[in-house]
Amino acid sequence: RSLTGKLVRVTELDVALGTSSPSAEQLATQANVYQMIFESYKANVPESQQSGITIWTLSDNAAEHEYWLSGDAPNLFDANYERKHAYKGVCDGIAGKDISADFSGDDWKNAYETEGEETPAE
């Protein structure tokens, strides 16, 4: 824990795999590492000093990795902008639990529906 009282921010986070074609096991490990980082941040940095965690870039698309980790798959979305296991790892880390059992999307949908209107995703 920081005794200085200064804000603590993790910036430009990514979890490199060393390949642009990771195996299912590598993807699961990547998700676990992302989850561990978020859980560790929440557990070890006092809430009053938590200033956030930013991810280096959005996806594994080659256009986003021209100068950094070219030929790797370090991010939350794959090259086609589909969520990877890492996305769930981050969500679970933020929530502090496995959210898949609790999340159907209905809560979000119901929060945005009003009578006679469609949800933004429809």
Residue ranges and their predicted role:
Residues 1-122:
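Aromatic-rich peripheral "rim/lid" segments of glycoside hydrolase catalytic domains that contact
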